[in-house]
């Protein structure tokens, strides 16, 4: 998308801007305007990755939340990413939390959201997956409905797992959104063991051979991360996605940031997510594949995630601030929208 259009979209509230951006991208793709408008990332000299039976054509993919309902698979896939992750999807549709629920902090290339797993539900997403002609690696991020109690919450994950298994190249279990009350309780030792045991049994029933990842919070202590790593290995999951958004705020942050509730993402998450990434990489001893996400907005920050121990990297928030361009491959930014 051209910079003038991107600048115009910034006059809308962040959630509306996000929806309009994706809609315009979809139209441009259908009309074969990507080349004319310079809408494509250049991943020149980037290496591929083979993991299990999947080939990631490059190391950069989109994070869950960008395309919650798998409505934009083709137009996002045509940008050149190595993989896409859609969702988070819940069994039943839900509208999420009241608006306004997304807040842009442009000075810091950061966003706070309290969306609350708003999505059109499992059936809608599955129908889109069935229709998709995307030939790259496609992951699906699954969650639980907000009104589900503890017992039903695990059932929600199993319902989504069964629903998407036929179509997902990998599945991500999202236990880390801060905007669904009680969801992060699944990080505790007993809860994570119960959840992953059920997921493991379901995997065997379905003979699901593709990778399963667990997406974690950046707000836990080292002991919790060690327990999670042990559980992920014990129940034969394949890796971790580090990290989701943070509810913690730096003391030096402005009052507008510290006073806004929700999950913080973008550049202000970068250091914190990197700390967790390094801890996870050090303690998993290369037994797990790690996907790094959080605050990547340059070539340097992309490669730093890889140096810290991730094999793949995801982006989302910084796509709200920049647009893909052919010049990206020749500048210090990696592509800038990373």
Features from the language model and the residues they span:
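Glycine-rich beta-to-alpha transition loops that act as phosphate-gripper elements at the mouths
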Residues: 64-67, 216-221, 289-300
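Conserved small/polar residues in nucleotide/adenosyl-binding loops
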Residues: 321-326
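Glycine/Thr-rich beta-alpha phosphate-binding loop at enzyme active sites
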Residues: 22, 28-29, 33-42, 177-191, ...
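Short beta-strand/loop segments at the ligand-binding rim of alpha/beta enzyme cores
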Residues: 55-61, 135-139, 206-216, 283-292
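Conserved, mostly hydrophobic/aromatic
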Residues: 13, 62, 84, 125, ...
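A gly/proline- and charged-residue-enriched helix-loop-helix capping module
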Residues: 94-134
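Catalytic cores of alpha/beta
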Residues: 73, 222-231, 297-308
């Amino acid at each position: 998308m051209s910079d003038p259009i991107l600048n115009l979209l910034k006059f809308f509230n962040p959630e509306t801007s996000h929806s309009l951006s994706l809609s315009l991208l979809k139209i441009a793709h259908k009309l074969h305007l990507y080349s004319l408008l310079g809408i494509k990332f250049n991943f020149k000299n980037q290496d591929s990755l083979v993991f299990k039976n999947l080939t990631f054509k490059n190391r950069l993919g989109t994070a869950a939340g960008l395309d919650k309902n798998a409505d934009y698979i083709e137009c996002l896939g045509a940008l050149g990413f190595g993989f896409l992750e859609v969702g988070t999807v819940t069994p039943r549709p839900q509208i999420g939390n009241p608006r306004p629920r997304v807040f842009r902090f442009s000075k810091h290339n950061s966003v706070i959201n309290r969306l609350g797993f708003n999505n059109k539900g499992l059936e809608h997403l599955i129908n889109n997956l069935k229709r998709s002609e995307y030939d790259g690696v496609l992951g699906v991020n699954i969650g639980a409905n907000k009104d589900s109690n503890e017992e039903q919450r695990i059932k929600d994950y199993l319902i989504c797992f069964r629903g998407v298994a036929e179509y997902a190249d990998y599945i991500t279990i999202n236990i880390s959104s801060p905007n669904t009350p009680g969801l992060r309780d699944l990080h505790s030792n007993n809860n994570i063991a119960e959840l992953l045991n059920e997921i493991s049994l379901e995997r065997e029933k379905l003979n699901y051979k593709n990778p399963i990842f667990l997406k974690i919070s950046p707000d836990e202590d080292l002991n919790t991360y060690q327990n999670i790593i042990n559980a992920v290995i014990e129940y034969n999951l394949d890796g971790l996605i580090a990290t989701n958004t943070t509810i913690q705020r730096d003391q030096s942050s402005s009052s507008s940031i510290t006073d806004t509730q929700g999950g913080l993402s973008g550049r202000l998450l970068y250091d914190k997510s990197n700390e967790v990434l390094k801890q996870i990489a050090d303690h998993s001893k290369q037994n797990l594949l790690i996907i790094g996400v959080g605050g990547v907005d340059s070539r340097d920050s992309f490669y730093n995630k890889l140096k810290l121990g991730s094999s793949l990297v995801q982006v989302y928030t910084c796509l709200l601030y920049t647009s893909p361009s052919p010049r990206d491959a020749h500048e210090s930014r990696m592509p800038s929208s990373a």
